[in-house]
């Protein structure tokens, strides 16, 4: 396929905007984009309980427009590069999959649950809760874009003065400001816990729909087998899954017909005034615990993917690409989508298939049409979401592998340590979800079994992560423990009773205060899981950075990261939490399940920061012991650093040669 407007190369040849092999890239990237759109529709409904008017009227139109804009930009960038390299391949672009999960589980769902428990489970309360969740999600998306933009501008400045600084000094400064290893290592924990595990559970729960598509992807991803006619593995997996579901009678024509009610053009609207006008200082700080690391993820991911393209011979301006991506992410947030965009992994794959300039623009255009017309709802009832789960399982596994690959081999323990806070957060999410369900809060009335189908099946799938911003219970710090629920040890220590009233996170936390070990669930301290879950992304980054510096015997670097961890804990971005106290069915106040960040130490700046949502009806844990712990870390490492600098520290010999140490990438 050739274009009417070819791009000219220096040799007089022309680089067509579209070639026949662009179809391979189009179907492959298009399948990925379709999966993400289906996930947005399914998870927004099942996890955050957003109504259709928000999903199909605000979020998807903005997301589709962003995908189209990004792919058009990268197609134009490829046209420019084609003037010197005719076989150039455009960078693939789409919604950040990990960012999607982070926003859903760690910004929007916690905000929804907290507001619902504060406002009450009424029609008005639910609407206020979903609006608050959507608003905070969009704010977080814009915040991540701002972090990415500032980071890219800073790196551009460093690149500009590189000649004056010298290559080594510039490289060292960049690694100090942007430690890629620890950032990617923390991403690995999210990928394995909240992405891979979520979908693995569903794959094994629906083997008759998901296993054959899983086998297709195993063959294409791991064995690198080329399918007949060059069919992308993702596309074949979706087709096979749909065939199996329809063949088993799990999909229905009536559901497809009913979904046509959502079809119709939706014009994206500018929501800047609504989103930014509703911002309170505490909202910004609560979201910062997520959007700061999310912005760093996007920054590092975009840089690495653009650099990977350069290794394949397609050299795109790194700073320019990252800056444009940050602007598109900010735009999509202000247009109503909480989900950031990014350059996708896979440029080398599409280049190997022979795709060139036009494949991304075609895929982006189709995704935009589906999103802007509400057609995603129809497709969600034609293709079972379970058929797409193997794709997401591989995404999670690939990102985790990339996290370990971002470190030298000797830093493997540092990468492993970074997984711990994320796995603790995953465990807390399961505990919290169970308690909310047994209390009749998430699923107030049991539903009759429904067939596995499209977008609604996504909702029935995993009951993913609850998240950051979790309140605490009395007895954790500022207030004495005066539980309304069992004041004795009875019923708090052993099997949690399943009742309509349930037992709450607050009660389990207080039980731990009454008797060490009394607040355990399956052997795990709920308070400990909660402490690790608060700001776990920062905790993962700091653990990895500290460990990597210690492996390299860079004690002063480890001390620096320990001090930074103490500072963020003092602010309230890590470990500190508040559990709200809510009114039970009998009208009495009781320990709740709604947890939130608390910035009690910043009350001198703004009194509202010291009081979490719910006012005084909350118990606050300031994490002061953890601040002291990080300071002790810093003191120990500082002393060792001084001793080593003075040559008074005896070091054990390692098996790593000096040449390897000097050649390997250092964290700081």
Residue ranges, per PLM feature:
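Early transmembrane hairpin of solute transport permeases
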Residues: 12-218, 347-377, 381-392, 397-407, ...
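Membrane-embedded helical hairpins/re-entrant loop segments and their flanking transmembrane helices
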Residues: 13-17, 49-54, 69-88, 283-357, ...
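Low-complexity, proline/glycine-enriched hydrophobic segments characteristic of transmembrane helices
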Residues: 427-532, 575-621
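Hydrophobic alpha-helical transmembrane segments
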Residues: 137, 141, 201, 205-207, ...
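Membrane-helix interface "capping/anchor" motifs
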Residues: 76-85, 221-233, 352-358, 403-413, ...
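N-terminal alpha-helical transmembrane segments of multi-pass membrane transport
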Residues: 1-95, 108-112, 570-626, 636-660, ...
């Amino acid at each position: 396929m050739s274009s009417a407007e070819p791009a000219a190369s220096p040799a007089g040849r022309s680089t067509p905007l579209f070639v026949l092999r662009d179809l391979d890239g189009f179907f492959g990237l298009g399948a990925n984009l379709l999966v993400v759109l289906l996930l947005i529709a399914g998870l927004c409904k099942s996890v955050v309980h957003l109504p259709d008017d928000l999903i199909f009227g605000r979020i998807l139109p903005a997301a589709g427009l962003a995908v189209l804009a990004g792919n058009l930009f990268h197609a134009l960038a490829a046209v420019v590069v084609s003037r010197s390299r005719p076989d150039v391949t455009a960078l693939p672009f789409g919604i950040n999959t990990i960012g999607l999960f982070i926003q859903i589980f760690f910004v929007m769902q916690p905000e929804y649950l907290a507001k619902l428990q504060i406002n009450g489970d009424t029609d008005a309360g639910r609407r206020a809760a979903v609006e608050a969740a959507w608003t905070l999600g969009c704010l977080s998306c814009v915040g991540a874009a701002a972090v990415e933009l500032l980071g890219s501008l800073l790196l551009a400045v460093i690149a500009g003065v590189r000649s004056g600084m010298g290559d080594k000094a510039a490289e060292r400064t960049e690694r100090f400001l942007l430690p890629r290893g620890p950032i990617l290592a923390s991403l690995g924990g999210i990928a394995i816990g909240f992405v891979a595990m979520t979908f693995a559970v569903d794959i094994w729960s629906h083997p008759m729909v998901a296993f054959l598509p899983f086998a297709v992807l195993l063959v294409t991803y791991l064995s690198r087998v080329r399918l007949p006619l060059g069919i992308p593995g993702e596309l074949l997996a979706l087709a096979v899954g749909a065939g199996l579901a329809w063949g088993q009678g799990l999909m229905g024509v009536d559901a497809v017909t009913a979904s046509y009610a959502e079809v119709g053009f939706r014009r994206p609207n500018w929501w800047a005034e609504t989103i930014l006008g509703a911002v309170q200082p505490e909202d910004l700080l609560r979201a910062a615990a997520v959007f700061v690391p999310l912005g760093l993820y996007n920054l590092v991911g975009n840089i690495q993917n653009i650099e990977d393209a350069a290794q394949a011979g397609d050299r795109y301006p790194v700073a320019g690409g990252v800056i444009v991506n940050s602007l598109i992410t900010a735009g999509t947030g202000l247009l109503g989508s909480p989900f950031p965009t990014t350059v996708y992994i896979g440029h080398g794959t599409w280049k190997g298939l022979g795709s060139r300039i036009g494949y991304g623009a075609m895929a982006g255009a189709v995704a935009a049409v589906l999103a802007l017309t509400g057609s995603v709802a129809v497709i969600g009832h034609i293709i079972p979401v379970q058929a797409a789960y193997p794709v997401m399982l591989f995404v999670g596994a690939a990102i985790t592998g990339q996290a370990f690959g971002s470190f030298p081999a000797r830093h493997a323990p540092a990468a492993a340590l970074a997984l711990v806070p994320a796995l603790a957060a995953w465990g807390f999410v399961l505990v919290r979800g169970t308690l909310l369900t047994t209390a009749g809060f998430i699923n107030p009335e049991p539903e009759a079994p429904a067939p596995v189908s499209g977008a609604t099946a996504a909702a029935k799938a995993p009951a993913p992560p609850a998240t950051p911003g979790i309140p605490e219970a009395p007895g954790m710090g500022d207030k004495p423990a005066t539980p309304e629920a069992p004041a004795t040890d009875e019923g708090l220590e052993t099997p949690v009773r399943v009742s309509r009233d349930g037992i709450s996170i607050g009660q389990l936390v207080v039980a731990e205060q009454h008797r060490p070990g009394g607040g355990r669930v399956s052997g795990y301290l709920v308070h400990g899981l909660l402490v690790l879950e608060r700001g776990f992304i920062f905790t993962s980054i700091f653990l990895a950075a500290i460990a990597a510096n210690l492996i390299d015997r860079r004690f002063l670097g480890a001390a620096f990261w320990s001090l930074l961890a103490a500072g963020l804990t003092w602010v309230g971005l890590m470990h500190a939490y508040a559990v709200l106290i809510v009114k039970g069915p009998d009208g009495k106040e009781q320990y709740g399940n709604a947890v939130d960040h608390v910035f009690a130490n910043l009350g001198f700046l703004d009194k509202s920061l010291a009081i979490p949502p719910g006012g005084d009806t909350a118990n606050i844990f300031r994490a002061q012991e953890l601040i002291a712990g990080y300071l002790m870390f810093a003191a120990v490492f500082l002393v060792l650093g001084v001793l080593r600098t003075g040559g008074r520290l005896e070091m054990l010999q390692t098996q790593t040669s000096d040449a390897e140490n000097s050649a390997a990438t250092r964290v700081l």
